[in-house]
């Protein structure tokens, strides 16, 4: 069982060393879940004397006003009889104190280091471990004494500040409250009882200690309180008799003081029947036993909390990404890895592993065909325009059989309108590829970590897509131009010819420009244009995929990688500049994760040894 108190001691020290003081923060706290005994009392309640009686040493700063200005985590370790007593501070890990006057001075000095030589308070605890054959295994947290007024040099808020600090400790469900009250004052005015009642109204977590019993007015006693009639708690009240100021001035040692305390309770008629559960020795043993019991009952819940929090911390650290490398090679490698991750996510969108690539197919299967169908050839193939172009094409010599030049001009003027849908298809795919770049950037966690790199990768990707768009537009429009530049002769050869039995055309020269003849030309040209549209409907997507989609998959960041290899370390560093808030958060998370893993290892070691 003693291993359990030692276990909590180790975890408490780790908490303080790694910055977990149980304060409200954006980080999970282990400190608040650890069972502890918090010592609470007013400034004149005898709180310090009780602690020194439990330890058996003079070691706490004394004086008027607020002497305890930081929480003191006092960890007592019982060692073998005959061993020399010593003390250690967490902030001085390799220094042993055998002179307890020096311990008192170090407590005062360490307090001043945190608060300055003022009368301010701080919630950052001091950890003091005392090793002695004359103590029980126990951990106590000495809190600043409650006060009702601020003294000179203290802010007006000091009364509330101390109450808030004390309350922040004792309101935790795993905290045992050691409420120190002087017997020579009305219990109804006890600062310790008042604040403990606020957070523990049933008294299940509160242990009452009554001091200054020997200083009560003659004819009065504390029997009603000690027997639980005046104020009932779950645990019996414990009375103690501390050294008087005269004893302290005369350096009366603790062994003699404990002996006189025992004699007082055994010889005083009012308390004789309670003597076996009175005194600082009984208090220390009772607290040690109770703390062991509480720790044992809380360990499973603490283990569960630790495991859950470790998983949460690891997940958040993964989201925040790794810290930046210091050397140029490490920075370059980090940038390349991030870019490769982004590039793979972009490819996954195109290949259907992630959503979005299907929209490109929609351009080819719906948008382009619909645009081709919407083309209007009324102007090019109107009777007036057909007559005009055929007449102009004939020049001064009318055509003999078929107006070939007129056909060519009419077909070319019609096919040229296909450039619009072709360009629109290229632009639509370009827009979709840019959207996929932005999606891939938002899904690449490491790019969120480095805003500068995110901007550069985004700009480089868009630049590449624009070059690919321009090349795709050139190649795609070239397909249209090729259709305009060379007609499919077989289409016209397969058309039926109107000739008489003698092999002569049925139309005379004079009726070649009538409406029926012109209408037939228009119908023929429209059929040819529709055939070309059907061909381009399949060849335009091929050109776009080859020039844009395939090329984006193959070389989206090639130009950026070329430039990256030329960059100096200063430029590389600028790309990996992080938001300072993220850097601070990662550092804090790493320290907190170290704490939880350390606690996990300590608990596992104790469980293994049992």
UniProtKB/Swiss-Prot annotation:
Residues 142-145 are annotated as: G3 motif. Keywords: Cell cycle, Cell division, Cytoplasm, Cytoskeleton, GTP-binding, Hydrolase, Microtubule, Motor protein, Nucleotide-binding. Expressed in seedling root tips and root elongation zones, young root nodules and young leaves. This is Dynamin-related protein 12A. GO terms for biological process: cell division; receptor-mediated endocytosis. Residues 518-610 form the GED domain. GO terms for molecular function: GTP binding; GTPase activity; microtubule binding. GO terms for cellular component: cytoplasm; microtubule; phragmoplast; plasma membrane. Residues 211-214 are annotated as: G4 motif. It comes from Glycine max (Soybean). The term phragmoplastin refers to the location of the protein to the phragmoplast across the whole width of the newly formed cell plate, unlike phragmoplast microtubules which are concentrated on the periphery of the forming plate. The lineage of its organism: Eukaryota, Viridiplantae, Streptophyta, Embryophyta, Tracheophyta.
